[in-house]
């Protein structure tokens, strides 16, 4: 199956040159700030990381280089990781994972998600350049900090995608859980976007798109306790005015509010003449669902392949 998917993604590649020189520019830049461009990357089934691990948290992902902790902003959480294969002469589509299970910090240091790592490894092996971003958390960074961080990260990717063989015209962010809200907010609120934060499409998985009327403590920490402001913080109106293609997915075993919000987003977009591609997952969703690494997300993987094909076809005569 993986070989078949590799062929599908490789078909989506477009020709370019100069990756070797770009890689040297990247290495020089990383050395200048004390970083190593060749940090280890994960296998398909990484072992648990030791407590004191920072970036050396997994074994090798054959054929893929992971570059860690690239700063896109001033905060310690404003960092990106990237996974890319050494493929001179090719500009590849770019995916950016915006994945997070919560809106607020619990005061502990969060480990890198092994599911995101696996998805990045798979993407790098199959004709894509994959980034993952972390972002600021409430209560220190309330709404709209998440959306602004997405904008800053996408802007950084625009400026630097070529260093990893990526095509800045084919950037597809993938938001999961709380990250789906931040990505949706970025898309829906043009005032949070930056001049070079254009995306070619987006994938939203198991998110909320309007604060609940009775939010939990983490959401209240991010959105505030004044429910009269929640409509203004909603992504639903703004998403009807964007022109990039969307994929919206949720799981049939998600909490009911996630199912309801996914269905509401779909209905709202279709009512505005901007129907998204949708996928209903049979198991609990995860960042790895976009590549069907859980064996239960073939529909979502198909939607992503269709989206990449649609975006790639725009450059054809």
Predicted regions located by residue number:
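Primarily recognizes the serine-hydrolase "nucleophile elbow" in alpha/beta-hydrolase
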Residues: 152-218
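C-terminal catalytic histidine-bearing segment of alpha/beta-hydrolase fold enzymes
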Residues: 249, 256-259, 263-266, 270-317
